[in-house]
Amino acid sequence: MDETKRSKQEALDKRYIRMASIWAENSYCQRRQVGALIVKDKMIISDGYNGTPSGFENVCEDENNLTKPYVLHAEANAITKIARSNNSSNSATMYVTASPCIECAKLIIQAGIKRVVYSEKYRLEDGIELLKRAGIEVIYMSIES
């Protein structure tokens, strides 16, 4: 990729990761709000944020402030929306505000996503390592950058 294309791609990446951050504000979760966008050919084809499944009360934490086990991650919400649409995530880019966990990494691989841009590092790196092992381009990008 030449310098001009790289610069344009970086500018797009910055915009989309900021948009994912704004989308995270839709989450009802108190402990952590995470947003994800799936982009293909410069079009947002899906979005998601962490939260409870459809039809459940929008309360993510239990009385001990622990995340309930059935809360969906932003990445899973975005990928399942694709599955219910006419879109394909094959060769798309996912922008997500937190580094994917191992379970979401498996979904990303199976969805055919080829790039992941994330803005917040998580204490566990196993999801990132799995994505790289699968040949997915992984980019850390601070929202402030």
Where do the protein language model's features map onto the residues?
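Zinc-dependent deaminase catalytic domain
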Residues: M1-S145
